[in-house]
């Protein structure tokens, strides 16, 4: 399988999950502005939506959308720690959290990365984000991971998008549980391996 990614983008989430599962993916960097892959392919031909991540399966099919990809990867290995079994309430809870991160956090960052976004809109979006992080903070103040006592694909996704806060000057200092969570996730060997492969860190940090 091949993962099309952009360093530090939301594609980092499935990259982390693959490392957590021990799945050996080939990876290909994609320029999200020119829509060209590192090998020169037209990314529009791979994913007509035009954005990462895209997972090219061994049979040539392409799966898109991060939450779908991370669940697919976990299911391939039957890993019910990273993603509970289909049809269970626990799986529905996972999907509930993935949807929250997608719609309420991930997408809210989008206008903050655009140069032409008016300042008033930036401030409104930042205020919206901090309100959404208040919910996450309450969860993480009571437990180590989003869904309880073990790391799931939702944690990989939250970590990935929350890394963007510094780039858009979003102050998260009022969320100590969230910041502690980010540090915990960053120290996981699979996370460091994915970040190293994407050039986000220069070497793994010793535990």
Short names for language-model regions:
Residues 60, 161, 199:
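Flexible loop residues that form catalytic
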Residues 196-207:
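Terminal-tail/helix-coil boundary detector
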Residues 73, 97-190, 194:
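GST-like fold's C-terminal all-alpha helical module
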Residues 38-41, 186, 205-206:
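Short secondary-structure transition/capping segments
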Residues 1-124, 137:
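GST-like domain detector, emphasizing the conserved glutathione-binding G-site
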Residues 32-33, 151, 180, 200:
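Positions that flank functional sites
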